[in-house]
Design a protein with these regions (language model features):
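Charged (often Lys/Glu-rich) extended helix/loop segments that serve as interaction or gating elements
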Residues: 87, 96-244
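Short glycine/threonine-rich loop-to-helix capping motif typified by GTGT followed
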Residues: 35-41, 72-84, 109-120, 179-181
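Residue-level recognition of conserved structural "scaffold" positions that shape functional pockets
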Residues: 8, 31, 37, 73-77, ...
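Active-site beta-loop-alpha junctions enriched in small/polar residues
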Residues: 27-34, 63-70, 104-106, 135-137, ...
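Electropositive phosphate-/nucleotide-binding environments in soluble metabolic enzymes
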Residues: 1-4, 8, 40, 78, ...
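Active-site-proximal beta-alpha core segment in soluble small-molecule metabolic enzymes
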Residues: 1-62, 71-76, 87
């Protein structure tokens, strides 16, 4: 990105180049934004820049506000998309600008679920662990960002809840999906890690030679496998033995 204080000079230089055509201003102030003020502050700064460029004879046609509306992972209360658009439109009255938004996370995050099964329960003097068959290579956000993901048993059971750390089978201290969750669990239980639709598969890896998970699209009462699980043979397919 370009510092907004340097932007006028950069646009002026671009305007001098015959093979460049200036059409817009774009910004990206972050992701998982859960309040309107940061968006509106960025918008005001961009509008001031657009007005300054106009005095230099540079006409801006489109405005990309970038960033992304946040979603509710836990107790966040992000603004509604309609409120966001209304606030932006109010500030753009009388301006002939094509608007571009990047709402990816808000569209897909809460539409995705990572399903994982409890393989073992491990009780120690200090902590209880639920070892599941998913791992940080499948969903790295908790390990990478300390992200909080809601975990729900697919079939709830009665019993005394215990506080579990949900960990995967990878030999890494950071291999966890959730920590300190009050759950009633038994080996074999299926768990849903919710809000996994954004930055899930796209950030997954083959660490520890683990094939990436299959993806299933659910439409009403129908389910379709839209990406099959990777096989071990596929992971080795790109490798070659050294010559004899």
């Amino acid at each position: 990105g370009i510092d907004i204080e340097q932007a006028p000079a950069v646009y002026a230089r671009a305007a001098e180049l015959a093979n460049l055509r200036i059409v817009g201003v774009d910004c990206h102030i972050g992701s998982q934004l859960t309040s309107l003020p940061p968006f509106l502050d960025a918008l005001e700064r961009l509008l001031a820049l657009i007005d300054q460029l106009a005095t230099q004879g540079i006409r801006i046609q489109h405005l990309d506000l970038g960033g992304g509306l946040g979603v509710q992972y836990r107790d966040e209360q992000p603004p509604l998309a309609g409120d966001y658009i209304a606030a932006v439109r109010e500030r753009l009255k009388g301006r002939a600008l094509a608007l571009v938004f990047e709402p990816g996370r808000s569209i897909v995050a809460n539409a995705g679920v990572l399903l994982t099964r409890v393989e073992y329960l491990k009780h120690t003097a200090h902590k209880d662990f639920a070892i599941v068959d998913a791992a940080m290579n499948d969903l790295i956000r908790p390990a990478l960002y300390q992200a909080w993901m809601d975990v729900t048993p697919v079939q709830p059971r009665d019993g005394q809840a215990r506080q579990y750390d949900l960990v995967g089978p990878i030999c890494e201290t950071g291999d966890f999906l959730a920590k300190g969750r009050e759950l009633v669990l038994a080996e074999g239980d299926l768990l849903a890690v919710r809000s996994a639709g954004a930055y899930g598969f796209v950030m997954s890896s083959n660490y520890n030679t683990r094939g990436r998970a299959a993806e299933v699209l659910v439409d009403g009462e129908q389910a379709f496998e839209v990406r099959r699980r990777e096989t071990l043979a596929e992971l080795y397919a790109g490798e070659s033995l050294l010559p004899q």
